[in-house]
A protein has these predicted regions:
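Conserved alpha-helical scaffold segments that buttress catalytic/binding sites
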Residues: 2-157
Length: 157
């Protein structure tokens, strides 16, 4: 039986407060090879690039929360075995990793980035630097709350 794979496009720019991230996701969507039979899902993200405000110490917290929530819903609806994610910044990984952690008991995550993404609102204001902390249940309390089964530190390298 063939595994179900989805292509998830999340052009989030608010989590990093950088409109260029939006276009990065769109470029990746176009240049990445497509395989027949893989459903492509795009999470709607505003492209007005208006200045963002802080909420609870987090840049655009409500907008970013809604995007992650919409991503969780889209993934749950499709119930894939694999997820290919193209996004503007690191936060787009939260919903896919959280879903896969629920689906697979032995999930391991190799986190490769220029910074560890283990911040919280007391340390840094942009959500893209909190994604791994959110997955571990130690980041932004609002977005960490969207993770139904947190990663254990032993699952992350």
């Amino acid at each position: 039986m063939e595994k179900k794979t989805i292509r998830l496009i999340v052009p989030d720019w608010q989590a990093g407060d950088n409109p260029v991230y939006y276009f990065g996701a769109k470029i990746l969507q176009v240049i990445a090879p497509k395989k027949e039979g893989q459903k492509e899902i795009t999470i709607p993200v505003p492209d007005d690039f208006k200045p963002l405000e802080r909420e609870n110490g987090v840049t655009a917290q409500s907008a970013v929360y809604q995007q992650v929530k919409d991503t969780v819903s889209a993934i749950d609806k499709e119930a894939p075995d694999k997820i290919i994610t193209f996004g503007g910044n690191c936060l787009v990984s939260q919903a896919p990793f959280a879903y896969l952690n629920e689906k697979y008991d032995d999930l391991g995550v190799l986190w490769v980035d220029a910074h560890p993404d283990i911040s919280n609102p007391e340390i840094y204001e942009n959500e893209h630097a909190m994604v791994l902390a959110n997955l571990l249940g130690a980041g932004d309390p609002k977005l960490s709350g969207l993770v139904r089964k947190t990663l254990k530190p032993s699952q992350v390298r």
